[in-house]
């Protein structure tokens, strides 16, 4: 029996609702498979923890997480806690502290979901966005001076290192190489940002020589939004900076129907530390407690987690079940359905148990 230790951090808003659904689905997969077991420990860190203790997680939080094989994360953010506190107090310390430098966000249109793009046919939108997750625009460098005065100044310093850009570029090329189309698009803004972004372009060209079977091209980030919208079929694997990929992946989720179906994996490719898996939809306090949160993104990121752990059959079984359920029209309101979180979760669990799934 293969056994794994998972740290669950439901955190804020709909996070507890979708993580509970994800754990239910993982249990269904365990029962169906019979050859692996997941041991889960749940941590109450997040905005409520902050209101009680003045921090989003305890000082030894990373030490507590090191013993786990993976981290299953819900969402962070609350209306009554500043966003920079919630983000820099929990999610980013985990990503940066564990050097989860590859943020991987697959996007495709699932069966039964009608995308907003009128002329987007089956298979036209099937992408993976690779986001540099350790530096760049979210390095945390900068400051403010002369606070409250007319001459107040605020600076945000983007930091790009050769080692950081090279490793994410190599990761993206390897991923593109493993996909059927072997196609990579490198996104920058190197016409206007003439230092770090030009270095990105140069390193992309250097790394490309290691992957002669991968076709690659370059796009400026503003033009990329147009290409994603009007010519989705021309894209496959995409790599971009921390900020650019953050924005583009939200657009990708919307083009696929909803952020409620968009997953992400924060990967330490060298496996020195646990990687973290989460939906990208955020805390969504406008629907918190209503029971209508879309759990599909959480199921998809659970599949990413299983694949990372080496349970490829279980990951494939989960995604097959998800696609059967969406194709049957069992959908939450954000993608045009009338089902609630529990109904979608139950349907996926039933599909996992069914004999017609892998």
Swiss-Prot record:
<comment type="pathway">
    <text>Carbohydrate acid metabolism; tartrate degradation; 2-hydroxy-3-oxosuccinate from meso-tartrate: step 1/1.</text>
</comment>
<keyword id="KW-0520">NAD</keyword>
<feature type="binding site">
    <location>
        <position position="250"/>
    </location>
    <ligand>
        <name>Mn(2+)</name>
    </ligand>
</feature>
<dbReference type="Pfam" id="PF00180">
    <property type="entry name" value="Iso_dh"/>
</dbReference>
<dbReference type="InterPro" id="IPR050501">
    <property type="entry name" value="ICDH/IPMDH"/>
</dbReference>
<keyword id="KW-0464">Manganese</keyword>
<keyword id="KW-0963">Cytoplasm</keyword>
<comment type="function">
    <text>Has multiple catalytic activities. Apart from catalyzing the oxidation of (+)-tartrate to oxaloglycolate, also converts meso-tartrate to D-glycerate and catalyzes the oxidative decarboxylation of D-malate to pyruvate.</text>
</comment>
<dbReference type="InterPro" id="IPR024084">
    <property type="entry name" value="IsoPropMal-DH-like_dom"/>
</dbReference>
<dbReference type="GO" id="GO:0051287">
    <property type="term" value="F:NAD binding"/>
</dbReference>
<keyword id="KW-0614">Plasmid</keyword>
<keyword id="KW-0456">Lyase</keyword>
<feature type="binding site">
    <location>
        <position position="246"/>
    </location>
    <ligand>
        <name>Mn(2+)</name>
    </ligand>
</feature>
<comment type="pathway">
    <text>Carbohydrate acid metabolism; tartrate degradation; 2-hydroxy-3-oxosuccinate from L-tartrate: step 1/1.</text>
</comment>
<keyword id="KW-0560">Oxidoreductase</keyword>
<dbReference type="GO" id="GO:0009027">
    <property type="term" value="F:tartrate dehydrogenase activity"/>
</dbReference>
<protein>
    <recommendedName>
        <fullName>Probable tartrate dehydrogenase/decarboxylase TtuC'</fullName>
        <ecNumber>1.1.1.93</ecNumber>
        <ecNumber>4.1.1.73</ecNumber>
        <ecNumber>1.1.1.83</ecNumber>
    </recommendedName>
</protein>
<comment type="similarity">
    <text>Belongs to the isocitrate and isopropylmalate dehydrogenases family.</text>
</comment>
<feature type="binding site">
    <location>
        <position position="222"/>
    </location>
    <ligand>
        <name>Mn(2+)</name>
    </ligand>
</feature>
<keyword id="KW-0479">Metal-binding</keyword>
<dbReference type="GO" id="GO:0050319">
    <property type="term" value="F:tartrate decarboxylase activity"/>
</dbReference>
<dbReference type="InterPro" id="IPR019818">
    <property type="entry name" value="IsoCit/isopropylmalate_DH_CS"/>
</dbReference>
<dbReference type="GO" id="GO:0000287">
    <property type="term" value="F:magnesium ion binding"/>
</dbReference>
<dbReference type="GO" id="GO:0005737">
    <property type="term" value="C:cytoplasm"/>
</dbReference>
<dbReference type="InterPro" id="IPR011829">
    <property type="entry name" value="TTC_DH"/>
</dbReference>
<dbReference type="GO" id="GO:0046553">
    <property type="term" value="F:D-malate dehydrogenase (decarboxylating) (NAD+) activity"/>
</dbReference>
């Amino acid at each position: 029996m293969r056994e794994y230790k998972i740290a669950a951090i439901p955190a804020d808003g709909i996070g507890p609702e979708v993580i509970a659904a994800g754990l239910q689905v993982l249990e269904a997969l365990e029962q169906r498979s019979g050859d692996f077991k997941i041991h889960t420990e749940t941590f109450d860190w997040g905005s409520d923890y902050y209101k009680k203790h003045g921090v989003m997680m305890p000082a030894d939080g990373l030490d507590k997480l090191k013993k786990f094989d993976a981290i299953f994360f819900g969402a962070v953010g609350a209306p009554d806690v500043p966003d920079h506190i919630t983000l820099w107090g929990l999610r980013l310390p985990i990503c940066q502290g564990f050097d989860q430098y590859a943020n991987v966000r697959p996007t495709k249109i699932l069966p039964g979901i009608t995308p907003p793009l009128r002329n987007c046919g089956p298979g036209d939108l099937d992408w993976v966005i690779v986001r540099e997750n350790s530096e760049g625009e979210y390095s945390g460098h900068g400051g403010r001076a002369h606070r409250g005065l007319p001459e107040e100044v605020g600076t945000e310093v983007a930091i790009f290192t050769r080692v950081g850009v090279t490793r994410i570029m190599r990761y993206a090329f390897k991923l593109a190489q493993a996909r059927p189309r072997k196609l990579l698009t490198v996104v920058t803004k190197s016409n206007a940002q003439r230092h770090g972004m030009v270095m990105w372009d140069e390193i992309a060209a250097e790394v490309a020589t290691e992957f002669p079977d991968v076709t690659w091209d370059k796009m400026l980030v503003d033009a990329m939004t147009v290409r994603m919208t009007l010519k989705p079929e021309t894209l496959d694997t995409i790599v971009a900076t921390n900020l650019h990929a953050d924005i583009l992946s939200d657009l990708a989720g919307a083009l696929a129907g909803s952020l409620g179906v968009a997953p992400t994996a924060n990967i330490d490719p060298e496996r020195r530390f646990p990687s973290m898996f989460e939906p990208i939809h955020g805390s969504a306090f406008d629907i918190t407690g209503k029971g209508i949160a879309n759990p599909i993104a959480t199921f998809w990121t659970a599949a990413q987690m299983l694949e990372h752990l080496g349970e490829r059959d279980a990951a494939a079984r989960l995604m097959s079940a998800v696609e059967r359920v969406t194709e049957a029209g069992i959908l939450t309101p954000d993608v045009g359905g009338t089902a609630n979180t529990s109904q979608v979760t139950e349907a996926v669990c039933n599909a996992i148990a069914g004999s017609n799934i892998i």
